[in-house]
Amino acid sequence: RIAWDEKESKTLYYSLKDIQLFIAGLSMSRLHILQGISGTGKTSLPIAFARAVGGGCEIISVQAGWRDKGDLIGHFNAFEKKFYEQATLQALYKAQCPTYADRPYIIVLDEMNISRPEQYFAEFLSALELDPIKRKLTLMTSSQNNAPELLIDGKGIKIPENVWFVGTANHDETTYEFADKTYDRAHLMTLPRHKHTFEVDKTLGPVTFSFSSLEEAFEEASKKHADTVASIIQEMDDSDFLEVLDNEFNVNWGNRFERHLMRFIPVMLECGSNIGIALDHMLATKVLREGKATGRYDTDGENIDNLIEALESFWENCTSLKGKPEACLKLLNQELKKKSQT
């Protein structure tokens, strides 16, 4: 259902791993960042997922020069006593209406980093860290007469629990880098160019999955595999890998990273993947990513060698981890190559 877009008569070729990572990310965070070169399907993936599960989807084209939330959701004209809303605000309201209130709803921020997300998306970043019941935005300072009934006290709006934000990102001279706080809170994926095609069943009819059933499945997975993930976290905490990270790179992880692991890894397992692939992805995107443990000027080749050795040793000694940490090793070996050329 993800692969075949009947409306557009278009076939989308995503790998099983890409789908597994995307779904597990939904359990982990309400904010996704999809990276990759043009043409890899960054915008199409969330649209296809929403279509496949019978959910809602709104595409927001981020514009250069956005500075604050008013650019994203609209602004109140005090003289006219009128709120000029943008499509994002309409989507937040629509997601709460009866048709979509119990369906997954995805708001795609296309070219999210063509402006600085930490400016125009700042209030959303803060709100998404709160308990679902506390996630809301203030639209105006005082309540207005005849305000839409789903507004809070006639002057604010809830960020519904069934809403996910998916930002697509390019990295070139026209865009900005994301701040650490954005990367730390988001689920990050880099979509590769899809070289392989496969047979697609175009006869599958539409289905609808409720938001509540999706959340229930996520919760059941988290409970089922909680002890397994907790054991992996403890082994990492006691490993030479963490000691090298801390002593030579001044990098560690906190409660948020561990919470993300407790949500992400179980869903990956239930989607048919394994702990090694899941942990490899999380370490590569959260701990070893460019600018954190790699891409730095205060480390040298010896530091990278020590980190590779510690990582491989941890992987070999941990019986629940299969294969090799391919994403992590690719990052570290690329970094080692850069160091050798300077």
Language-model regions: role of each:
Residues R1-E216:
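AAA+ P-loop NTPase catalytic core and its hallmark functional loops
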Residues D201-T342:
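Alpha-helical lid/collar subdomain of P-loop NTPases
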